[in-house]
Amino acid sequence: MIVLGLTGSIGLGKSTTAKMFAEAGVPVHDSDEAVHRLYSGVAAPLVEAAFPGTVVDGVVDRAKLGARVLGDAAALKRLEAIIHPLVRADADAFLARHRTAGESIAVLDIPLLFETGGRGRVDKVVVVTAPAEVQRQRVLARPGMTEEKLAAILAKQVPDEEKRRLADFIIDTGQGLEAARAEVDAIIDELRGQRGS
């Protein structure tokens, strides 16, 4: 089974692209969704122990947790030390299930693939991109988003240009949904061809 890492900076269309892979029948593990699930499950007591008062009714309150780690590099590192191994274990279980089921390709949707050392876990990398102004417009249209928040997020991410340089495949969502879907289909066809499936 070929493990495809899907990544891209905020606002570039990674989530939309992940849905396109799923709609084409490729299993997709969404790291962000896994975090949400873990926050209401096994991660909750671990997060509460590290950040008292951030769990309400057995579920991590993301706003309270965010207030505790935002701008505090040491706190963020503590949180990542709790969450990243759990997400990785969740992804490993996902891959094992789909490998056993005989899938030819599976996608790990990892927003911070390069930043968290995830490159070594995948066979190929797809980077989703779009022009910087398109990214800015998309992100600033989100509720509660500001120029300052966007700048802070981008400062923690590998620049888009560098991600594109490291990619095996690039999908430009700035060209529209149909063009992006055609690129997804072409990648799937190429990878299935490599496996002889």
From Swiss-Prot:
Pathway in which this enzyme or protein is active: Cofactor biosynthesis; coenzyme A biosynthesis; CoA from (R)-pantothenate: step 5/5
Keyword Kinase attributed: yes
Domain (DPCK) ranges: 3-197
Catalytic activity: 3'-dephospho-CoA + ATP = ADP + CoA + H(+)
GO BP, sorted A to Z: coenzyme A biosynthetic process
Binding site for ATP: 11-16
InterPro entries named in the record: Depp_CoAkinase (IPR001977), P-loop_NTPase (IPR027417)
Stated role: Catalyzes the phosphorylation of the 3'-hydroxyl group of dephosphocoenzyme A to form coenzyme A.
HAMAP family tied to this protein: Dephospho_CoA_kinase
Protein's name according to its UniProt entry: Dephospho-CoA kinase
Gene this protein is translated from: coaE
